């Protein structure tokens, strides 16, 4: 049986470029444990240029091959691609649209599902349409006096708010606001990251995460894990990835009643199926002191860094990541 030429595409143009490279390390290590794959790792830089790990400039053509700038090197045909890209253009659905156009099979959610989840406003509309509770919010489409007034009114009503760029990941362009004097500056900063902004009520709650993925034709939802931060600390981009981070994680959240855990997992599967996700996701929830469950967000290509929850939760559920990848890839290619 011939090996599968697998393109591991990583990097991208977002603030999460470097995190994507760390996740790609995990994928590369996992794929190396299987003899099925010839893996070519290619980095997509912030300017849309492709380069191999060996430093060769190249491009992915519509003939489904990697063509090198050095024409003495033969083109490398691509059978399958893993777009290990957090943020733009991976989780936004843009790169998937190109793969669809050139009929190149790929790992992960399809373009529309990715786009729907990445935009926080669209995602919340979907959550509500599916009957899944989520945090109270308003959304804004431009930085003007009306937006400032709406945000100040939300702060007065809710006491504390989060102002978030609607189309960013990993808490990029996301700010906690407790004082009216901070509204103008925070709104301006958030609109600097995206043309749409969402304002959410601050929820004092535990932050629980569920790995949801397809395995042998079944949608699996793991037991919820938990992100634990210091009191009143927001789990920012830096708090997630800085070496000095005081946040810690539990692969299985402690002291969550069984019925609450079951309901969280049921909501996670409902969101996965209802929004037509594919292969993998990490779905994040809030759990309040009185056991109110609120869906926070969906990550359609969750991180796989040494501190990331998705691979840990999958493994804790009894599944091997290499075998999981092999099953997904072989099943998809067999269905072509």
From Swiss-Prot:
InterPro entries: ATP-grasp, ATP_grasp_subdomain_1, D-Ala_lig_Van_CS, D_ala_D_ala, Dala_Dala_lig_C, Dala_Dala_lig_N, PreATP-grasp_dom_sf. Its main location: cytoplasm. It is found in: Cytoplasm. Pathway: Cell wall biogenesis; peptidoglycan biosynthesis. It comes from the Bacteria. It holds the Pfam family Dala_Dala_lig_C. ATP binds at residues 154-209. Its cofactor is Mg(2+); Mn(2+). Binds 2 magnesium or manganese ions per subunit. This is D-alanine--D-alanine ligase.
């Amino acid at each position: 049986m011939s090996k599968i030429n697998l393109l591991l595409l990583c990097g991208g143009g977002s603030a999460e470029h470097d995190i994507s490279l760390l996740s790609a390390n995990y994928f590369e290590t996992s794929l190396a444990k299987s003899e099925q794959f010839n893996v070519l790792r290619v980095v997509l830089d912030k300017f849309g240029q492709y380069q191999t790990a060996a430093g060769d400039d190249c491009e992915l053509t519509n003939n489904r091959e990697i063509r090198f700038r050095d024409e003495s090197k033969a083109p490398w045909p691509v059978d399958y691609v893993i777009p290990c890209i957090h943020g733009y253009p991976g989780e936004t659905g843009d790169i998937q649209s190109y793969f669809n156009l050139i009929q190149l099979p790929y790992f992960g959610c399809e373009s529309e599902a990715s786009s729907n989840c990445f935009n926080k406003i669209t995602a919340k509309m979907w959550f509500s349409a599916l009957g899944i509770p989520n945090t109270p919010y308003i959304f804004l489409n431009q930085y003007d006096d009306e937006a400032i007034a709406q945000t100040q009114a939300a702060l007065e009503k809710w006491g504390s708010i989060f102002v978030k760029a609607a189309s960013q990941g990993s808490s990029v362009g996301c700010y906690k606001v407790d004082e009216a004097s901070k509204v103008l500056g925070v709104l301006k900063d958030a609109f600097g990251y995206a043309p749409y902004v969402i304002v959410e009520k601050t929820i004092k709650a535990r932050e629980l995460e569920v790995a949801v993925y397809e395995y042998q034709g079944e949608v699996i939802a793991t037991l919820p894990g938990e992100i634990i931060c210091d009191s009143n600390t927001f789990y920012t981009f830096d708090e997630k990835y800085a070496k000095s981070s005081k946040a810690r994680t539990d692969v299985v959240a402690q002291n969550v009643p069984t019925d609450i855990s079951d309901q969280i997992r049921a909501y996670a599967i409902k969101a996965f199926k209802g929004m037509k996700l594919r292969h993998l996701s990490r779905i994040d929830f809030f759990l309040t002191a009185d056991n109110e469950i609120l869906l926070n967000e969906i990550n359609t290509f969750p991180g796989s860094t040494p501190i990331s929850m998705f691979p840990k939760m999958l493994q804790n559920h009894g599944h091997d990541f290499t075998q999981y990848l092999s099953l997904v890839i072989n099943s998809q290619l067999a269905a072509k």
